[in-house]
Structures are given as C-alpha cells and as structure tokens.
C-alpha cells in the first residue's frame, strides 16, 4: 500500500462523526416546531399578509389559478420582511435550466436613492414575479444564440419560496420558470406545470362526464426515492476519474463486494448517519417530508425517501435535497455520488418515481375500491395508463436516457431497457377476465399466517413487489423505477402526465361516442375491453432480468433500446411531436431543442470520460506499472547467477512467467490506450450530435472498456504499494 493511501486510511480511522448545529433538547429545534420554518408557505403568509391577500395567494398555491398583479407588491413586501427576519440579505430567482442543475443569481435587498446616502431594503412585486438572466449562457438546443441573450424567469407561486442558509448569511430563493424572450420554455419546470394542468383538465372532464364527479383540480403526485453513495472525501480527491466524471473508470473487483448481502438495511455507520441526520433536519426546515433512510444493497450506498407531494413541489424538493446532500457531506468529510454507476461490480443507483393522481378532496384515483374489480373508475384510469405506456414506451425510455443509466438499465440490478408494466396477480386476473368476458371473482383479502405463536395474522397486499419491472403497480401508485439517480425528475414526470392525459381523453371520447348507440355500461365495457385487448401486450408480471423476457418482448413487438443514442432518436418522431404540440406541453421547436441538448450532454459526458481515462492511464497507471516492471526485472536478474549455478534446478521459473505477464499486460494497456486516443481525435470530425453519439457509443465506449480491462488486470498483479489510486476495497468499505 502506498504511503499516501496508508495516510488516508489512518486519517479516516481517526475521524469522528460531525455534530450538526441542532440541539433537539431545545424546544425551538424540535421537529414539530421547525418543520417548514424555512419556507414562505401558508403558515408564514398567514402571519405576514393582509387577510384578503392571504386568501388569494392560498387559492393560487392550491389550485394553480393566476396571480392578481395587484397583490404582488403586498406578497413581495411580506416575503421580504419574513426573509429579513430569517437573516436573508439577498434574494434569487431559483430555476432549473436544461443542464440538469439548479441556477440562481443573487441580488441584495439594498437600494440607494439618488442624492440620498441612506440605504433602504426593497423588494417589489415586479422583482418577485420577473427576473432577466442571460438566456444564451444556458443550454437551449439552438433556441437562443449567443447574441440573443434575453430570457425571463417567472415566479411559480405554487411552489413556496425558501431560505437557504450558509455559514455567513442566508438567501431567499424564489422558485421560478425560465423562458426565452420569444416565449419558448428553456427550463424543466415550465413544461412540468403545463403537463400537470393537462392531466388535471383531462381527469376532471373524464370524472365529470363518465362518473358525475365534480372536481376543481386533480394533481399528479410524486414520491421520490433517492439513492446515492457516500464515500470519504480523501479517497474521492485522490481519484481523478471520480472528480471529473462522478464514476470510477478503472477499478478491479475487490475480494469482497456485496455478495454477503450484509449492507442492505444494515446498521448505519456513525459518520454516515450523522451526515444524513443533518440533511434531514435541513430538509424538514424546508418543508420536505423526508420519511425513510436506510442502507442500500451496495456497500457505501444509501437511500432517503419522502412522503408523496404534488409533482412540481416534489421535483423542487428533490433538487434541493441533492444540493444539500452534496454540501452537508462535504462538511462531514464525505462526498455524495449521484452517478447511476460509480463503481463496477456492485449495484448502481436509481431514483424510483412513485406516481399517482390525487383529487382536490384527497382521494387517490389509483387506489382500488374494496376490491379492484368493483371499482369502474379505477379500471378506467388503469386502462388509460396501460394504453399510454404501450403506445409511448419509446418516450418513457427516452425520458430516462442519461449517460449513467446505460451502465445500469438491463443489468441484474435495475429494470431492463424494455418498458413494460407489472400489475400483480390480482389485477392481472381482473384484466384477463375483462378481456375474456369471464366473471370477475372478487379475490377478497387474505391473511398471512406466520406460524409463530403470539404473532397476529397480517393482511396480504393485493400485489407483490417486482423489482425487475420498470413500471410497477404497487397498490395505489405506479413506481417508475428506470429513472436515474442523477436525473432531474421533471422530464420523466412530464412524459407520464402527458401520455396519461392523452389516453384519458381518447378513452373518454370513445366511450361517449359509443354511448350514442348503446347504454353507458355497455359502452364503458366495450371500450375498456377493446383498449385492453389492443394494449395488454405491455403487461408482464415475470422476471424482467431473464433472457426469455427479451425474446418474448420481441415477439410482442415491444422495443428494446439499451443505448442512450437509440433511445433519444425517437423523441422528435412524428407521433411524439403531435402528442406534445396538440397538448400544448412542448412545441416542435421546444421538443427538438430538448433532444439536441440530451445528445449534447451525452456526447460531452462520454468525451470527458474518454479523455479522463486516457490521462489517468498515461499519467498514473502506466508509471506505476513501469516501476513495478522494473522492480521485477531487477529482482529476476539478480538471481540469475543462482539459477544458472543450480544445474539440477528442475522447477519452472515462475518468476520469469510473472515478469512476462506484466510486460505483456503493460504492452496491451499501452496499445489499447493509444487506440482510445486515436478514437478521441476522430470525434472532432462529426458535425451532427446524433452521429457523434452513435460513434461514441459503438466505438469509443467499447475501447474504453478494453483499456479498463487491462488496467484492472494490472491492478491485481502490481505491487500494492505502487498502485497510484485508492482501490475499491478501500473506497467502498472504509468510512
């Protein structure tokens, strides 16, 4: 082991958990008192706004109705006074451009009038509602040129403003949308809000026309399970690949990985739990209802998850959570990795999106009745979702097509790249009975008898959990498991909202058309049955990891798009352009720009990885191998006189064999690395992002895998003290 790595290990061994600035014995820091205290939500508004203003802004937040400009100044003043009491000196419009990160520009509250040296603290309604950042400096997919810089941020009143606390002050952050001067959406939030409105309207009309239910708003809800790795910061900084790419580009399989199955739900390391506890307190102050935390399957991997929230708020909270996890982990001497596959040979990370639809009265539209077979409303929404996923599986796959997910989807740790739906035995029986015109037998609710005296019988859930399915029904929601851990959740949710809304409209119109010639019940049964017959092919309740499923999916006509370039190609198909433009979610220009940006992100990510790998091998791995090679050669040469003097020495000279293996492996690594460099140089010859992505996927990535193969082999035979970077056995297990 190198002296440097030994120093890291000794340092890590001496580290103690870092205490957060929270004293839970103090009443002011109790959860019930501090929850939501750093957001300008309804509680803070009630205390700072006039009654009529509060009622109006509450209506805006709860129903999504338009904000009256006349009350904007009152809201801005109340927000400013509240923020100043929280220690804020600056405010910012906090928005989500198309680069996958949050963006903000800080402005202080201070104002000075001409001829008056007195400083005033001001914040107007116009400053609250509208900002003007440079739109040309963010990814736009061609919508904005460098000389077309004007863009606008617009307050999203449905998502509360919040305080971000730093060591030397606080900032008032105002969630906003971001658009160009010509009106195109340049962010992740705007189309999400549009899609929420679309699915709300289509659900309201469907419930009114077919079930005589009256609602003002239906909200898509999300519960987001965030997975991540926490590793020691010293190991991270000693790995250029982790610093540059967020994942390791080399690294031999350690003697122990996750095969003992001892990490999942295991007792948390004290440094780790101290870090996560501080994150929880910060998120609770921001009004995020974090509920669970636990060790995940891979060593060093963890998960936190909140209670369901309205989709746009859940999306904002997830971005805030990722940001706070990064910052707090640094304080604790750790680094939080969100890459989908930071380490080869152990499970990668995802971000399961639990999606449902909730009425303004609090009812879950995906909650079956006493039994699913008795609930026509549930069956209609279920049928609409089945149809939506079948027709638009390509879009769902594209919505999770990020570079890191290529390493995860399709492996025996995550859902396959084939999009299918898992319903469970009970619902599958109901669906087949509808299709086959057989009587629907209500299964009733069974109990599980654990066979232990003193243990009560436990009610069985109506569905099992199928972790191999990318889109699974789990009792009262659908769990979209293919979303990558590093992703902004907005685009997958936009797609889901949009395709379900379109499907609801189609089925409703078909039923209403059929009702002109038959009874309501007959029309309902016919259209539901016909729709299920046409789209039930997407339902699969078996093992998604099996090779048989790939063959079966192919026979059913389901697409298998394992690579990111393949998945992104279909985004701007005629079908998808029509879907988004007719629903006013994304114009053809906005959709094409997103496809272009996703290709750009993929290409830049792979090129960074390829260059990082070449440099890592050239400047760290090969010098270590040369030194080891020299040591072996000198050692073997030093014993040559002895070997030559032993005429009866009959044993094969394994030392020569070992030297030959090292020399050959080093030669192969040099050759592979030079081939990689040649391919990197070829990337400059491409004018199309699409064709470049295909080249990177089919040529550069396979060559990177070749380089890694030889490097990892050498890691296993080069003297440990000579190896230049921390190994998996150290990074994954030492905290």
From Swiss-Prot:
Reaction catalyzed: L-glutamate + NH4(+) + ATP = L-glutamine + ADP + phosphate + H(+)
Pfam families referenced in this protein's UniProt entry, alphabetically: Gln-synt_C, Gln-synt_C-ter, GSIII_N
Keyword Transcription regulation attached: no
GO biological process: glutamine biosynthetic process; response to bacterium
Domain GS catalytic: 188-621
The GS beta-grasp domain, residue ranges: 89-183
Cellular component, GO annotation: phagocytic vesicle
Enzyme class: ligase
Protein name: Type-3 glutamine synthetase
Organism: Dictyostelium discoideum (Social amoeba)
């Amino acid at each position: 082991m190198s002296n440097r790595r030994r120093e890291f290990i000794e340092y890590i061994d001496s580290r103690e958990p870092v205490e957060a600035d929270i004293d839970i014995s103090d009443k002011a820091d109790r959860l019930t008192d501090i929850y939501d205290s750093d957001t300008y939500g309804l509680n803070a508004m009630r205390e700072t706004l006039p009654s009529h203003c509060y009622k109006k802004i509450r209506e805006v937040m709860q129903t999504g109705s338009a904000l009256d400009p006349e009350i904007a100044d009152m809201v801005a003043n109340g927000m400013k006074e509240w923020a100043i009491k929280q220690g804020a000196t600056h405010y910012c419009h906090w928005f989500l451009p198309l680069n996958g990160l949050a963006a903000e520009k800080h402005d202080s509250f201070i104002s000075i009038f001409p001829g008056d040296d007195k400083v005033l603290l001001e914040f107007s309604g116009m400053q609250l509602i509208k900002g003007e950042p440079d739109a040309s400096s963010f990814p736009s997919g061609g919508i904005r040129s460098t000389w077309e810089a004007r863009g606008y941020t617009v307050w999203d009143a449905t998502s509360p403003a919040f305080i971000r606390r730093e060591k030397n002050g606080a900032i008032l952050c105002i969630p906003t949308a971001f658009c160009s001067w010509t009106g195109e959406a340049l962010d992740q939030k705007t189309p999400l809000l549009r899609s929420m409105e679309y699915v709300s309207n289509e659900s309201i009309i469907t419930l009114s026309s077919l079930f005589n239910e009256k609602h003002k708003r239906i909200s898509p809800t999300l519960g987001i399970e965030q997975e991540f790795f926490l590793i020691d910061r010293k190991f991270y900084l000693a790995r250029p690949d982790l610093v540059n790419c967020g994942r390791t580009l080399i690294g031999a399989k350690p003697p122990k990985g996750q095969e003992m199955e001892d990490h999942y739900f295991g007792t948390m390391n004290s440094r780790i739990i101290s870090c996560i506890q501080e994150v929880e307190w910060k998120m609770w102050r921001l009004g995020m209802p974090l509920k669970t935390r636990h060790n995940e399957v891979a060593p060093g991997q963890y998960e936190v998850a909140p209670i369901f929230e309205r989709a746009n708020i859940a999306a904002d909270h997830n971005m805030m959570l990722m940001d706070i996890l990064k910052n707090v982990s640094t304080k604790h001497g750790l680094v939080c990795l969100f890459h989908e596959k930071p380490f080869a040979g152990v499970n990668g990370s995802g971000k399961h999106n639990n999606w449902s639809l909730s009425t303004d009265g609090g009812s879950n539209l995906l909650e079956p009745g006493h039994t699913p077979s008795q609930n026509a409303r549930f069956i209609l929404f279920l049928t609409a979702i089945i149809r939506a996923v079948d027709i638009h599986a390509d879009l769902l796959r594209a919505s999770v097509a990020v570079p890191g997910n290529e390493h995860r989807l399709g492996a025996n740790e995550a859902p396959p790249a084939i999009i299918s739906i898992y319903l469970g035995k009970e619902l599958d029986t109901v669906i087949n009975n509808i299709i086959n015109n057989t009587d629907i037998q209500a299964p009733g609710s069974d109990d599980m008898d654990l066979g232990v005296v003193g243990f009560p019988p436990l009610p069985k859930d109506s569905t099992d959990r199928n972790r191999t399915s990318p889109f699974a029904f789990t009792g009262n929601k659908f769990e979209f498991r293919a979303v990558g851990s590093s992703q902004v959740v907005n685009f997958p949710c936009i797609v889901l909202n949009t395709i379900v809304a379109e499907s609801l409209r189609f089925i409703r119109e078909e039923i209403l058309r059929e009702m002109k010639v038959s009874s309501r019940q007959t029309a309902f049964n016919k259209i539901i049955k016909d729709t299920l017959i046409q789209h039930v092919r997407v339902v699969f309740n078996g093992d998604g990891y099996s090779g048989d499923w790939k063959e079966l999916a192919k026979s059913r006509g389901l697409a298998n798009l394992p690579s990111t370039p393949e998945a992104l190609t279909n985004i701007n198909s005629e079908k998808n352009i029509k879907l988004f433009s007719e629903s006013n979610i994304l114009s053809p220009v906005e959709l094409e720009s997103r496809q272009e940006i996703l290709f750009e992100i993929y290409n830049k990510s792979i090129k960074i990885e390829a260059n990082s790998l070449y440099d890592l091998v050239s400047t760290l791995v090969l010098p270590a191998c040369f030194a080891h090679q020299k040591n072996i050669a000198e050692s073997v040469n030093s014993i040559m006189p002895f070997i030559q003097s032993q005429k009866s020495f009959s044993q094969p000279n394994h030392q020569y064999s070992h030297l030959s293996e090292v020399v050959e492996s080093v030669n192969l690594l040099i050759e592979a690395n030079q081939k990689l460099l040649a391919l990197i140089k070829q990337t400059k010859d491409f004018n199309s992002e699409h064709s470049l992505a295909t080249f990177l996927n089919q040529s550069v990535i396979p060559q990177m895998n070749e380089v890694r193969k030889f490097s990892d082999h050498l890691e296993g035979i080069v003297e440990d003290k000579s190896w230049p970077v921390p190994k998996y056995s150290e990074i994954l297990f030492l905290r």
